[in-house]
Each structure stands twice: as C-alpha cells, then as structure tokens.
UniProtKB/Swiss-Prot annotation:
Its cofactor is Fe(2+). GO terms for biological process: co-translational protein modification; translation. This is Peptide deformylase. Keywords: Hydrolase, Iron, Metal-binding, Protein biosynthesis. The active site is at 175. The keyword Signal does not apply. Signal peptide: none annotated. Binds 1 Fe(2+) ion. The keyword Protein biosynthesis applies. It comes from the Bacteria. SUPFAM superfamilies: Peptide deformylase (SSF56420). The gene is def. One of its GO terms (molecular function) is metal ion binding. Belongs to the polypeptide deformylase family.
Amino acid sequence: MSAQDKLIKPSHLITMDDIIREGNPTLRAVAKEVSLPLCDEDILLGEKMMQFLKHSQDPVMAEKLGLRAGVGLAAPQIDVSKRIIAVLVPNLPDKEGNPPKEAYSWQEVLYNPKIVSHSVQDAALSDGEGCLSVDRVVEGYVVRHARVTVDYYDKEGQQHRIKLKGYNAIVVQHEIDHINGILFYDRINAKNPFETKEELLILD
C-alpha cells in the first residue's frame, strides 16, 4: 500500500505521525505535477490535507490528536511527492477580542501551483518561520517576495490566477518551496540570520 493509499482511507485522519521530518529525501525532491483532470485519489488527498489543517487549528481536536497548529501543508510533507498544497489562514479577533465574522481569510487546496510573477521588494516575518517537518527552532529572517501572482488548479480542474501579498504571500511561498524540495531555513542568511536590507519589508 502506498503512502497515498493509506492516507485517503475513509477511516484515516492525518496526524503528526504521518508528517515526515527533515532528513527524509522526499522533502528534498522536486514533486511531480498531478495529471488533469484530477483523479479521485488526488482530490481525496487534498481534502484530507485540509481536514488536517482544520483539526490542527481546533484546540479540542489538536489536543486529542496531538497536532501542532499549521496554516499550510504540502503533499511531500506526508511523503507523497506530488504538487498539491493546502492553505488555511485564520482571521484573528479584533482589538476588542471579538471573533471574526469569517473564520478564515484564505482556504484552498491548490493543484500544480506556480508562481508566475513577483514583486521586486522582498519581505520576511518578524518572528521567522516554522515548519511541521522541522522539529527545532531556526531563527532568522526567511526572505521571500512581498507580493506574488500564482496560477493553480482547484479540485474541479478549473484554473485560477490569484495575487497575494503580506502573510498569505509568505504562506503560499513556503508551501510551494516544499514541492520544489526547499525548506524555509534555506532562505535564511547563514552568516547573518537577521540581516536587514533597506528594501526588506518586515511583517509583524
């Protein structure tokens, strides 16, 4: 039984046990494009990946299943070398602590995503980045594009083009790196992890 066959079984919930860690060669491979129209197995895998992200952000389910919270997951992280990513970016409460009207600012499974253009300006998160496949803290600015335009297919096989900036742009670049065999710390300046160039936009 392949890793994907196991993951898409109706009774299976993706947990941290399914997430492979740095050192596994799948994380360093360039993943293969999925065939269109999408097969049922690839659609199911995308749904399972999104289910994992929702569980990871739900305090009750996360504790029950022992999950670390995530806003994105790429198929190579569950040992399936395919160009599939899921993103689930939650909206935050307002300054008074009131819950947002919409739970998520972005919720999508992207098949064969590709960055087709990007800004000259770079950006990095002030607190750095983490990864479900990296069980350690790696400090430093992860330098990425401040804005990107991404082409992808949804589960219906429809093609989309979206323009992203800020945190959502960072998230999608992190996940697209995964399907290209790149880990976030590859983009940290090894000699000067917190180097700031004049044009670097630091996002809180």
